[in-house]
């Protein structure tokens, strides 16, 4: 059964939605599913741009055959070989054995590492600055290494301004019949998923993304066709601006995240006191997160959004409570930087988590750590009030800086 949509007069979306997968990359929850996008250009020569995960393989192949009709598939253009986009390549090769593959040298190498039977003469290796003409359409190739795999490239159709952006500009969430970003309320329905996708999948590679954005800024882009999520044909500066913030690690907006690690509720109670005092001072853009029950991908995503972070952790085995430690390791791995941070520690006989959390933050780039800290012994009491008030004042002063 065919279920494809037109992007332009001769370009079709031939992907599929997956509502069954619960964990993207077997780690990130996707409660609203995910789309695997592929595109088919019907020029004098036919060009399939990327394939799809095998979970939607049947729908994808039906769509390709539905658009092709009685025509042959001439070219398979591969921008990115991660299995969620490359898994259907063997079936494409079985159905159209004479198809010519256009991709990078490194992509061809990785495909063979995955066991794909690709003949050397079948591959047309391209690199930065190359282009290929398929009739009316000419597609130019731009290298995008480590966005977010080393073989990645993006492709630009110079005829109608279509950027095939691989995993850049993608998003979690199934399309559910929609195709274009202007068919949804993106700010309300999609932005959080797009941010969570970028920050957790691509977030480590901000400098590389900035290089791609710099190249993209010179192109007359009219459409952005990513491998996940909606196609952009309007408000393209909006999503480019979001990517500039995320890739440069600049907060989107001012806000204070209070992430707490609490075994029996005492550190949580202190975090709630802090939140109340901040709100009483007018800082209502304040959010609390239990690091033990909030999936890491949501914490990472919101920290790319907000400007301030308070870490409140109980001491555990003379160290940082393990889920909090894992959170800090993820922040370091994803290269998060340019945030203002504060520390609240707790411990019944040897509170030590504060110094250890501070040491981890100091290893990160451009992190401002406020001098005011709160150290609790077992539970928050009146003797902690003055230190907490000092911390609140420091956070308010930092928050209100221009």
Residue ranges and their predicted role:
Residues 4-65, 154-157, 161-165, 267:
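Conserved beta-strand hairpin/beta-sheet module of binuclear metal-dependent hydrolase folds
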Residues 175, 186-224, 229-231, 273-289, ...:
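FMN-binding flavodoxin-like domain, especially the glycine-rich phosphate-binding loop
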Residues 225-252:
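Short N-terminal or domain-adjacent regulatory/targeting segments
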């Amino acid at each position: 059964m065919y279920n494809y949509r037109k992007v332009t007069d001769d370009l079709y979306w031939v992907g599929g939605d997956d509502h069954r997968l619960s964990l993207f990359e077997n780690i990130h929850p996707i409660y609203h599913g995910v789309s695997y996008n592929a595109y088919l250009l019907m020029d004098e020569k036919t060009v399939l741009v990327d394939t799809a995960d095998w979970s939607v393989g049947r729908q994808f192949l039906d769509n390709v055959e539905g658009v092709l009709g009685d025509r042959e598939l001439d070219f398979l253009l591969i921008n990115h070989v991660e299995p969620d986009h490359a898994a259907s390549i063997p079936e494409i090769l079985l159905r159209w054995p004479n198809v010519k593959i256009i991709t990078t040298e490194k992509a061809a190498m990785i495909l063979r590492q995955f066991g794909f039977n690709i003949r050397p003469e079948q591959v047309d290796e391209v690199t930065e600055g190359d282009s290929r003409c398929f009739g009316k359409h000419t597609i130019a190739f731009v290298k995008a290494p480590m966005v977010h795999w080393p073989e990645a490239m993006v492709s630009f159709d110079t005829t109608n301004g279509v950027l095939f952006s691989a995993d850049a500009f993608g998003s979690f969430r199934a399309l559910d019949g929609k195709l274009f970003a202007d068919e949804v309320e993106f700010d309300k329905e999609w932005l959080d998923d797009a941010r969570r996708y970028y920050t957790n999948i691509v977030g480590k590679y901000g400098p590389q993304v900035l290089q791609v954005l710099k190249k993209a800024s010179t192109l007359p882009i009219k459409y952005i066709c990513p491998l996940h999520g909606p196609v952009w044909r309007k408000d393209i500066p909006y999503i480019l601006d979001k990517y500039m913030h995320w890739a440069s690690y600049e907060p989107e907006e001012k806000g204070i995240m209070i992430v707490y690690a609490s075994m029996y509720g005492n550190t949580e109670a202190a975090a709630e006191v802090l939140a109340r005092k901040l709100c009483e001072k007018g800082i209502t853009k304040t959010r609390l997160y239990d690091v033990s029950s909030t999936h890491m991908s949501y914490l990472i995503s919101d920290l790319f959004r907000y400007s301030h972070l308070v870490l409140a952790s109980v001491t555990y085995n003379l160290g940082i409570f393990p889920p909090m430690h894992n959170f800090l390791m993820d922040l370091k791995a994803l290269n998060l930087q340019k945030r203002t941070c504060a520390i609240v520690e707790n411990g019944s006989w040897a509170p030590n988590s504060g110094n250890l959390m501070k040491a981890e933050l100091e290893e990160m780039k451009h992190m401002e750590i406020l001098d005011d800290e709160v150290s609790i012994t077992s539970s928050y009491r009146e003797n902690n009030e003055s230190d907490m008030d000092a911390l609140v004042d420091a956070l308010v002063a930092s928050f209100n800086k221009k």
